[in-house]
């Protein structure tokens, strides 16, 4: 049996931006034989930072399901996707340039602040992010994060123009017609080509709900509720009940 666990990062795997608290979690999941898949709103560059720090070498899903990054030669069969130096990339979202074109049309009227029109100092203030991680977060490929706005109707306007607006732990994300669940389902289908799969997911936000819908067992950290997910206080509690 192949055991796959999809993990949100912010407020799920790590409480803040420091990867150190996640080290015992990753170590225990590896000991239990899990394939660990980060499924986060974070960019490829951000996730590569955490993958390196935590020694995780499995596929990962970036920017709210916008792209699946599969390390070359990870699966023993051919995968259709865009090839880079290190990955086969299955793209489900739209290019960030398309999103930013629309945001530029709206930013003044709606008072919108996002990565591309914010300074490094503003981003640090909005997010609490350490300065050294800001450049990684700014390497956006398929989405933008909305930090501030003056009029609520910006969400409806972008939705009417064909974009998806998703609420995360703290901010809104604007991306294409994709979500964490669609991407997780595609990746699970690839794993099933290797044999029977048992799937799990852990998250804390509304953007994790589509991911919960496609796995066998889901865990929700915090006070939100989802009909399929078991509420837990932390990811450490998850480790106590999964094998």
From Swiss-Prot:
It is found in: Cytoplasm. It catalyses: 2-O-(alpha-D-mannosyl)-3-phosphoglycerate + H2O = (2R)-2-O-(alpha-D-mannosyl)-glycerate + phosphate. Transmembrane segments: none annotated. Its EC number is 3.1.3.70. Disulfide bonds: none annotated. GO terms for cellular component: cytosol. The active site is at 8 (nucleophile). This is Mannosyl-3-phosphoglycerate phosphatase.
